[in-house]
């Protein structure tokens, strides 16, 4: 369970403090695939960084399981991050490492298992993302979709119970994007993981998520099931879901 209560965050700007998050309240149940949608600069990625302890809020509470993120020491945060697999939008592959070593990197760095276990885990991940036989390829020889698949394999190789994806299909064509979304859903179901995913592709997000949160100008304007989002009468939610164009959000 991820529980966010009253979280707010601002940053300094040329005209004073700029409020990025405003009194955010949401719950992500254990084993849920939760999607976050919203226009650019609505605070989605900032919220992800706070959930993982990479950024502190100005106020509010963030619970991951029984652990309070906002007051945790650096040592405690380091231990808490073992619960997370992460794939951020700019989380590029290491160009100088093979596909195998890219996927193995978090496993080796965080857990130091025997190399035999590393080989088994990486092989299993490559099979799951349909890249068996790509172990010795370099990132420069991969397509955009293949790179995303390697990123998914790297984010899940440690078998962390919580996985964070920030725009996992950004920049891909529609067919490849759908394949990535279907892969993420299949991975989540197989592991019964708790997943929080940011995406600007609402149509595809709604096909795979259990719950969805919609953000606008730092506020969470909707938090509910995917089915509830599709029938909501809240004007801004309707505009998100149905692509209405009668004026700006």
Provide a role label for each language-model segment.
Residues 37-39:
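The feature captures the beta-strand-to-loop junction immediately N-terminal to the Walker
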Residues 52:
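Helix-to-loop junction immediately C-terminal to a conserved catalytic motif
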Residues 68, 115-134:
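Conserved ABC ATPase "signature" region
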Residues 138-142, 146:
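Conserved ABC ATPase signature
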Residues 157-161:
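A short, proline-enriched helix->beta-strand linker immediately N-terminal to the Walker B motif
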Residues 163-166:
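Catalytic Walker B motif of ABC-type/P-loop ATPase nucleotide-binding domains
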């Amino acid at each position: 369970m991820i529980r966010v209560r009253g979280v707010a965050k601002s940053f300094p700007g040329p005209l004073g403090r700029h409020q990025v998050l405003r009194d955010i309240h949401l719950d992500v149940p254990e084993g849920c695939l939760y999607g976050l949608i919203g226009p650019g600069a609505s605070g989605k990625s900032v919220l992800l960084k706070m959930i993982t302890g990479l950024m502190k809020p100005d106020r509010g509470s963030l619970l991951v399981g029984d652990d309070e993120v906002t007051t945790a020491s650096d040592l405690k945060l380091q231990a808490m991050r073992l619960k997370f697999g992460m794939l951020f939008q700019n989380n590029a592959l290491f160009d100088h490492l093979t596909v195998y070593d890219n996927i193995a990197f978090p496993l080796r760095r965080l857990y130091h298992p025997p190399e035999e276990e590393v080989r088994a885990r990486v092989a299993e991940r490559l099979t799951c993302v349909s890249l068996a036989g790509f172990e010795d390829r370099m990132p420069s020889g991969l397509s955009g979709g293949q790179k995303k698949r390697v990123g998914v394999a790297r984010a899940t190789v440690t078998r962390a119970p919580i996985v964070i994806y920030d725009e996992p299909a950004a920049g891909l064509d529609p067919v490849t994007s759908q394949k990535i979304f279907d892969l993420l859903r299949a991975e989540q179901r197989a592991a019964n993981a708790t997943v929080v995913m940011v995406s600007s592709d609402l149509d595809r997000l709604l096909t795979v998520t259990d719950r969805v949160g919609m953000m606008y100008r730092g506020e969470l304007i909707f938090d509910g099931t995917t089915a509830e989002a599709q029938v909501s009468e809240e004007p801004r939610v309707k505009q998100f879901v149905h692509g209405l164009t009668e004026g700006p959000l």
